[in-house]
């Protein structure tokens, strides 16, 4: 599945912001705007035993240009919350359910 970072109208959002995938399916996060974005999984809101640092981008790493991507494969079933660290305060958060 492809998830856009930034809506077409320039909004600070993940599109889609709430979605489901099958275990082992790849998620590709793609910068859709000229703003720097990243993808960080919330260590308190992912399945037990999953290491957030192994599935997140480093906090200082940003997708700066439109079209830049970050891909991750989630194999543990459960619900994962994620956010863009520069824009978390603006509500740029999302959730994926792995079935």
From Swiss-Prot:
Cofactor: Cu(2+)
Domain of life: Eukaryota
InterPro entries reported for this sequence: BlueCu_1 (IPR000923), BlueCu_1_BS (IPR028871), Copper_blue_Plastocyanin (IPR001235), Cupredoxin (IPR008972), Plastocyanin (IPR002387)
Record: residues binding Cu cation: 37, 84, 87, 92
The Plastocyanin-like domain, residue ranges: 1-99
Annotated localization: Plastid, Chloroplast thylakoid membrane
Main location: plastid
GO CC annotations on file: chloroplast thylakoid lumen; chloroplast thylakoid membrane
Protein name listed in UniProt: Plastocyanin
Species whose genome carries this gene: Solanum crispum (Chilean potato-tree)
Source lineage: Eukaryota, Viridiplantae, Streptophyta, Embryophyta, Tracheophyta
Gene from which the chain derives: PETE
């Amino acid at each position: 599945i492809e998830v856009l970072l930034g809506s077409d109208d320039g909004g600070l959002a993940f599109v889609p912001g709430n979605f489901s995938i099958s275990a082992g399916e790849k998620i590709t996060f793609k910068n859709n705007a000229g703003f720097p974005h990243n993808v960080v999984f919330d260590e308190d809101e992912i399945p037990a035993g999953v290491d957030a640092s192994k599935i997140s981008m480093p906090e200082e790493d940003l997708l700066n240009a439109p079209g830049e991507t970050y891909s991750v494969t989630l194999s543990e079933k459960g619900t994962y919350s994620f956010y863009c660290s520069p824009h978390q305060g603006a509500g740029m958060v999302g959730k994926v359910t792995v079935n």
